Amino acid sequence: MAATRVQPSTREIFTTLEYGPVPESHACALAWLDTHNRLLGHHVNGMWLKPEHRNPAPCQDPITGENLASCLQAEAEDIAAAVEAAKIAFKAWSQLPGAARGQHLTRLAKVVQKHQRLLWTLESLVTGRAVREVRDGDVPLAQQLLQYHAVQAHAQGDALADWQPVGVIGLILPTPFSFLDMMWRVCPALAMGCTVVALVPPAFPTPLLLAQLAGELGSFPGILNVVCGPASLGPVLASQPGVQKVAFCGAVEEGRVLRRTLAGRGAELGLALGTESLLLLTDSADVDSAVEGVVDAVWSDRSLGGLRLLIQESVWDEAMRRLQARMAQIRSGRGLDGAVDMGARGAAARDLAQSFVDEAQSQGGQVFQAGDVPSSSPFFSPALVSGLPPAAPCAQAEVPWPVVMASPFRTVKEALALANGTPRGGSASVWSERLGQALELGYGLQVGTVWINAHGLRDPAVPTGGCKESGSSWHGGPDGLYEYLQPLGTPSQESFLCENINYDTFGLAASSILPSGPETGPSPAPPYGLFVGGRFQSPGTQSSRPIQDSSGKVSSYVAEGGAKDIRGAVEAAHQAAPGWGAQSPRARAGLLWALAAALERRKPVLTSQLERHGAAPTVAKTEVELSVRRLQTWGTRVQDQGQTLQVTGLRGPVLRLREPLGVLAVVCPDEWPLLAFVSLLAPALAHGNAVVLVPSGACPLLALEVCQDIAPLFPAGLVSVVTGDRDHLTRCLALHQDVQALWYFGSAQGSQFVEWASAGNLKSVWVNRGFPRAWDVEVQGAGQELSLHAARTKALWLPMGD
């Protein structure tokens, strides 16, 4: 690995033709630090806050170890003050017309442009990243983000008239982050009328500079507040009264801890976890271009994480040879040197990479590193790991920066199996000169972003996110706007925390079933079975639950489902999901309309059932009619789910795909037993999901009646309905590791447990927090909110050019 040369002789320059140093002066960054006497505090409500009796943390140059400044670490009262300032600012900021907010963001973009040299110099100095990446990439993109979201704020009054801002946003950023990560989240939040409190590590002062620039605009100083502190303060910020949403980007385990901490506290949680990306190199690819893609992905200071590299066997030897030769030409050095490719990230990043490499070698992997770096050096040579057995722990672990872990594959099917076999689903690139093969891989990858013959392209108009353990939050494009909006009229999110809940015992066992009185029929009513795998069957518990009518008499029995039945339903759903997701929107629409027609024919039976359970005749008739209409509505909407082209600043289209979540579990509310069941089932099926439902506990018979029409129409296993103790079934679904998403409409305790238990595989959850929902109202029963929760977005980049 070539290192930066210091004052070479003229003869050496003409002999070696190596790059010379191109140092960028950091005088402006030091001057800014000097204006604060090298002691930084927090920026709250447009002012610098330097409270007494706070522990200072050093801000150091990661290359030299020089102490650049000290930053006071926040305590709980500092965070409370920042949240209070954001709450006060929200009252005025959210009431502004979108055009006024857009003008404010435009002014901020001009201020950022005015001070861009200070921004890129300070960012490179304190992070160690190559200055050319910050100067030519991050800072211009930050300006584009402000300008794009200024335009979106102008259009909010028309396009998003039925939505309102969430409120105060708590933003938690990890230690290895760039200020651009903050801008991706701050810009849409401010554009939509929210205010922000950001908790950032004390070693990275660039967010404080951004907050200062925003505060210098004068008006609305409290819309962006930045406090510095350790990661342990994240739960403190997340738990503050008044914080309506928490956006967190960081490590997977930290995300799990935060998910459990926030359970029942009312705040929404958006997670963007992990930094690893994926690159697929096929035998039809331009190998040299793909090698440069690897460099861009992990060794050019654009990415914060490592790379998982899959190479087709027929080009394995050639690709590895060219990659190793390219590694020898990578220049690492001081980030402020404009001629370096890769800077240093500090001792923590170096030690993490060294630990991973050592562990991979101990598990049978082969490691190639270009150049020798002393153990005391802050730099870590680019590392290429290969030959790991598939069962090795490192083969499944997240790859850290700047490590590339290479594995071979034979066929496209095997490549997809290897790529989708990890719990992470962030971003990936596919390198192939055959468009059909590239699209097959791009559509098949379970990730949030796919680039074809490119890597790391970004544009404010294109959504970026992930799936699985990479989190389910989005930034950029229209999806990023909805992260900070909620349907108009939604009340403020208040804590519904149940202090006495025991997570270990909640729903652990079903309630005992005892004789409950005489039956209303002339003969014992036959019990309904569970609807699993396309047919009715007996439960694993071999017991039934009595269902009482409005007079308190037993009208029928339903099966008492348990963990075994949930397991069977989820397995059946996984078998049916691929085929249903591959169906065309027209085919899915036709089946939804057919189910609506079947319910129309069954209208007298369904109305009679509702009346027996206490519904007035007019209400029962209305509920059935609305249920039929909901199926027809989603049958119409499903045909509008095709791919949409996204306009970017680059040549070539970007496809915005809406893909199914996979297996979606739904716990239905007790109220509106037919309408709520259909209103939740229809959008889930329309977006290509396989569904496991727990119907109304008070009146599950309506859902089972609908299943009689589902059986002949839909593939076996696509829809399963399991009856029984709701808390017990909820526990089984929430803890199931093969359920990709869970909607829960029940008690506050159940909502809290679902949020807590979802941390296991970080499934996306949607809970009602114990509050009823007006299913008979179009906005709540068939609104866009259901569509947003029923599918995930994938951005597929198709850039053009050589």
Curated annotation (Swiss-Prot):
InterPro entries found in the cross-reference section: Ald_DH/histidinol_DH, Ald_DH_C, Ald_DH_N, Aldehyde_DH, Aldehyde_DH_dom
Superkingdom in the source lineage: Eukaryota
GO molecular function, one term: oxidoreductase activity, acting on the aldehyde or oxo group of donors, NAD or NADP as acceptor
Protein family according to the UniProt entry: Belongs to the aldehyde dehydrogenase family.
Subunit structure: Interacts with SPG21.
PANTHER family xref list: ALDEHYDE DEHYDROGENASE-RELATED
Protein name: Aldehyde dehydrogenase family 16 member A1
Organism: Mus musculus
Upper classification of the organism: Eukaryota, Metazoa, Chordata, Craniata, Vertebrata
Gene: Aldh16a1
